[in-house]
């Protein structure tokens, strides 16, 4: 059974990664040898990936498949996650194959080009343990990800089986290049192809430059980890411009994590009767660190309709059962000021997702707090009922506007 060791609680303000103004505190992980995967209500149980081992030696501490370690063994860090490791010894070969990845070329070459690398690779486990790899593919494709993007996945990393990876030194340049990259703050993510019949879908590879070893983590909660790592990769792509050029650091605002970037478009009323002007702003959606918002299927452009808040009172029960995200707009300050003024005067934004979009979100609401100067997005959990409710609201609004227009025309006719 994996037993995370909790760091002592310290009072003070701040999020889950530590107090305000302080760097994230390492999450120290310890585990004991287990005869089987965690059972019962403690988490998902992959039925085939099993770790079995003999009882631990007296006085020894064991972390997953990496064997006994001393109390002062150096740690392998993954962002704020500190993991202990052990040299390759008394291990059993569990898998042999090829690892493939792409790395950027040297700065003096074409910066947009990537160099494909491959290395013969073996995975080892402790004697007495069993890692079922008979369905693993013979070639694993690895994507390199900055470790700083993985700090939110600490709870999923803790609940993992470990295996030690070893590379045959046939290609010293490739191995040195991989050690250099991973020693400078990168981790490897191996996504197993869906056509593969094995139950492992993702595996993470870490490197200790001090111990000169590679360690693989196989999360027990494969489904949860796949969703989380997809979110990380999506965020990574959004933070990197065309050709792999960074458009800036990964944005974290008030301990919130960037989940989506695109454009918000809407029409706002003009002073002239029945006249509207089209507006748009670059837009970003943030979630709390550790939360996952599936935005990989969101369109790059969202269309918003402004609705008087007084028409939304009947939807309050559906608003209560919603997920909250934070919106941030950039660049055109005049357009942003205009949007703030309109929404501060009693309007809310209804963002309809195109039916062509394959994401599960069909509608979200945008509200503005003039006191805190922030935009809050509400994503109702009951999308179907909310869509029906908002349609009725919009239909009623159109009827009210139509009656108002007819009355205005009648008054003009009587005055003439």
From Swiss-Prot:
Task: Recite the UniProt keywords alphabetically.
Answer: Activator, Cell membrane, Cytoplasm, Membrane, Nucleus, Phosphoprotein, Transcription, Transcription regulation, Ubl conjugation
State the similarity comment. Belongs to the Mediator complex subunit 25 family. PTOV1 subfamily.
**Protein name as catalogued:** Prostate tumor-overexpressed gene 1 protein homolog
Subcellular location per UniProt equals:
Cytoplasm; Nucleus; Cell membrane; Cytoplasm, Perinuclear region
Main location, first listed in the record: cytoplasm
Residue numbers spanned by region Interaction with FLOT1 = 184-416
Q: Where is the signal peptide?
A: none
Species of the source: Mus musculus (Mouse)
The subunit structure is: May interact with CREBBP. Interacts with FLOT1.
Segments of skewed composition (Gly residues): 12-21
Sites bearing Phosphoserine, chain numbering: 53
What are the annotated GO cellular component locations?
Answer: nucleoplasm; perinuclear region of cytoplasm; plasma membrane
Kindly give the Pfam families that the UniProt entry links to this protein.
Med25 (PF11232)
Q: Where is this region: Disordered?
A: 1-54
Modifications the protein undergoes after translation, according to the UniProt entry = Ubiquitinated by the CRL2(KLHDC2) complex, which recognizes the diglycine (Gly-Gly) at the C-terminus, leading to its degradation. Ubiquitinated by the CRL2(APPBP2) complex, which recognizes the Arg-Xaa-Xaa-Gly sequence at the C-terminus, leading to its degradation.
Q: Where is the composition biased (Low complexity)?
A: 27-39
What this protein is reported to do is described as: May activate transcription. Required for nuclear translocation of FLOT1. Promotes cell proliferation.
